[in-house]
Curated annotation (Swiss-Prot):
Its main location: membrane. Assembles around the rod to form the L-ring and probably protects the motor/basal body from shearing forces during rotation. This is Flagellar L-ring protein. It comes from Pseudomonas syringae pv. tomato (strain ATCC BAA-871 / DC3000). One of its GO terms (molecular function) is cytoskeletal motor activity. A lipid is attached at C25 (N-palmitoyl cysteine). The gene is flgH. One of its GO terms (cellular component) is bacterial-type flagellum basal body, distal rod, L ring. The basal body constitutes a major portion of the flagellar organelle and consists of four rings (L,P,S, and M) mounted on a central rod. GO terms for biological process: bacterial-type flagellum-dependent cell motility. Belongs to the FlgH family. Keywords: Bacterial flagellum, Cell outer membrane, Lipoprotein, Membrane, Palmitate, Signal. It holds the Pfam family FlgH. It comes from the Bacteria.
Length: 237
């Protein structure tokens, strides 16, 4: 039974499967209102005892010699972004293989094969030979340079027992062509915070900095699925 539409259907299914695999290689798009980067509210203090007539009352103390730097959960701190990174990588590989094989048979069941050919020509001789050569060369290069400047104001999410501040937050900007976001999380030492309540991003330990976006501008910087196929490990050549 002939089914002329089956090969075309198979090609369609294979194409859809390939597109699905390639789409899985694309980095997921960040979405707003991520609960991990939501502002952390200060812990509710315990209710103070009623006024007992003393001059000093708990809950009304003020630090006369301190500053306004963040040091508690829920405090706000501004992070100054000053990130510059450049990386390059090159790889070259070359492989070659040559092989030669020969088989000669001059006798069969004890009888020589170099007798006269009854139909004329050369003597009978069973022999075979094989010569092969294979060469593979590859060359790949990659270079990347990034720069990120600006500022993001985040909140203190936790205070570790040694006084280190765990901070995280994000900034969303809606532009004409889409949304731009900057997310940052990490650990800040209180001594690195300046008097104006700012800290450089280079002083953040275990920093997680994300700069991404959505919309037409972000889409133009992404290669199409056909280009990703030729740059993926699925490409056989």
């Amino acid at each position: 039974m002939n089914r002329p539409g089956f090969p075309r259907f198979s090609v369609l299914i294979a194409s859809l499967c390939g597109i699905t695999l390639l789409s899985g290689c694309v980095a997921p798009t960040a979405k707003p209102n991520d609960p991990y980067y939501a502002p952390v509210l200060p812990r509710t203090p315990m209710s103070a005892a009623s006024n007992n007539g003393a001059i000093y009352q708990a809950g009304f103390e003020q630090n006369l010699y301190g500053d306004r730097k963040a040091f508690r959960v829920g405090d706000i701190i501004t992070i100054t972004l000053s990130e510059r990174m450049a990386a390059s990588k090159a790889a070259t590989s070359a492989m070659s293989k040559d092989s030669t094989n020969s088989i000669g048979l001059t006798s069969l069941f004890g009888s020589g094969l170099t007798t006269n050919n009854p139909i004329g020509g050369n003597d009978l001789s069973l022999s075979a030979g094989y010569n092969g050569a294979r060469t593979t060369k590859g060359d790949g290069k990659a270079a990347q340079s990034n720069s990120l400047t600006g500022s993001v104001t985040v909140t203190v999410a936790d205070v570790l027992p040694n006084g280190i501040l765990s901070v995280r937050g994000e900034k969303w900007m809606t532009l004409n062509t889409g949304d731009e976001l900057v997310r940052i999380a990490g650990l800040v030492r209180a001594d690195d915070i300046a008097t104006d309540n700012t800290v450089s991003s280079t002083r953040i330990a275990d920093a997680r900095i994300t700069y991404s976006g959505t919309g037409a501008f972000a889409d133009t910087s992404q290669p199409g699925w056909f280009d990703r196929f030729f740059l993926s490990p699925l490409f056989p050549f």
